[in-house]
Amino acid sequence: MFLRLLSLFFVFSLVFIPFVIDAQSQDKKVTYKKARALQTSTAKKIVKVVEALERVDENGKEDPDYLTVKEILNDLLEKGDSLRSYDRSVMWNYWAYLYMVEENYPKANEAYKKLLAEPESTIPLRVASLYALAQISMSQGNFEEGVKFILQWMDEVEVITAQGWSLLGGGYYQLGADKKLESEKLDYFEKAIESMLNAVQIAEVEQYTPKENWYIIMAACYSSLKPRIGIEESLNKQLEIYEILVNLFPKKQYFLNLAGIYNQLDRELDYMVTLNMAYQKDLLDKQGEYLALAQVLLSNDNPYWAAKVIEAGRLKKVPVVDEKTKEEKMLPVVKDTEKNLKFLADSWRMAQEIGLAIPIMEKAARVAKDGQTFIILGSLYLSEDKLEEAIDAIEQGLKKGKVKNASKARLTLGQAHFELQNFEQAKKEFRIAARDDDKDIKKTANNWIKYTENEEIRVKNIALRRDYIQNQG
């Protein structure tokens, strides 16, 4: 449960309170009962109860004597009919406290209700009991009763606290979640938001940080209210909440939720920035998260940083449990699959870091199931004037098969042979490419054939001139 039981308020001596005090949170007067005092015999026993609860051991650590407390309270219980109503209310308060310590919530609930039934119970005892009953009820899943008690508490308390509003908001949220009829669900979610906003407002006025859970509940409510307020309004309201959460409580899930909302609203730049913030804070720990950031960086003309993100994911290791052996191993977040390696190599290539792209593409080619990766590798080699390597890679790709466009690969292969002045082999590759049905490829191949023939003649002529000059000498 997101609601936890708070410390309990209890009274054991004289209570002096003004007869009427203005309520700060409502346009009403809160009337207090006259100040009351315990009977002497009851007061003595209550003093012993307090002493037992405040007992410390020889090291000064708290060591409550609950056994003595229970004995004294049982003695008071046996004399219950002879006690005054106020005395019984104090007794029930201590019984409730004891049951809470024992985590016997049904008994604590019963004790608080008996306290409220006492006609002479004072306002401080009543409001503390009502608040505790609201907490107990909600902790036990009885949200309807919990809401009833917190509303009653609000009627009787002088000042409604932020915690009170948040408790009510939590109750409304759970009631909404439990309802089957959509209109009832949405009504409760709206009430939950209103209550949580009141809690946040009070916390801000009193200059302390609102609780994380208050915002979480509001975000969940706004998400559920899509049928009533529309998808865009729902997303914008959630956006406001998550923008607060990432600043106050910078957790991974809040960054991802915020990024997801930006993405749904087509705010790609904000989506990228938010994911990058999570990355910079080292919050990302899943392959999909690293790849999503790299992809959006790449699509926004940041190939260098896309590559850096993927590299970081390859280096970062997280514990993974083997399903068969149940052994925990430290494995890289981003795995060296063919797809991931090609993504990384392409990013380095687009960043003009060909020297970094080549070893990655070499690794991708070794694990590839088809020849296409070798073709890409060959193109990278060619761009770096590694002609022999380019020829070898492209030939391996063509031999392996399943190449996307064999004719284009032949063109690239022919260009590599051309640069090595292997003119006959170059023309052979260009002629194969020229058989393609694609007009552009056919035209390019034929142009290369003519260019190669001309270059071959030029080179031969240069060689003849060189030989002639040497012979003349």
Annotated model-derived regions:
Residues F10, P18-K113, S121-A132, S139, ...:
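N-terminal leader/linker segments that initiate helical-solenoid repeat arrays
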Residues T31-A37, L77-R84, L116-I123, Q152-V159, ...:
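Solenoid-like repeat scaffolds
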Residues L38-K48, R84-W92, T122-A132, V157-L167, ...:
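Generic helix N-cap/helix-start motif at coil->alpha-helix transitions
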Residues V49-A52, V56, A96, A134, ...:
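Conserved small-residue packing positions in alpha-helical repeats and bundles
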Residues Y97-K107, Q135-K148, Y172-F189, A219-Q238, ...:
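Alpha-helical linker/edge segments of TPR/alpha-solenoid repeat scaffolds
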Residues L186-Q201, N247-L248, N263, Q280, ...:
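TPR/TPR-like (Sel1-like) alpha-helical repeat modules
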Residues E338-N405:
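Alpha-helical adaptor scaffolds
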